[in-house]
């Protein structure tokens, strides 16, 4: 879908370039191309929203007693030019607000852990904090012998977190 959007945007750009060079591209063709791009943006947006709704429904359907999420610094992530496009497309705020509404509707406690909680750097077994863990390290290896996927280890630590705020 993204490739199709890029292709259509390139086509629109060529139409504008043709006008600048003194060529003959009709305004009607440009309007049609803009409409195609708007429809593609709307379709991609609908797909993302649908994915969020289905994910939240799947989480709530398991009827947990509580759900723990991390309070992410989205505005800080948006300042990083390498992350900003990916972060914006994930719709973190929409996910969080819809999850909060579903939790209230179903009587599920939503726990929000502070963004500075070292969920990724803490060993789930021995609770030792590994200070030198880089983002590129995808496997968490502790001195106690515990080896696990970094994200799964963080999820276990968030589940067992004792300092949180109830939303």
Predicted regions and their residues:
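Positively charged, helix-rich recognition surfaces that bind polyanionic ligands
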Residues: 1-167
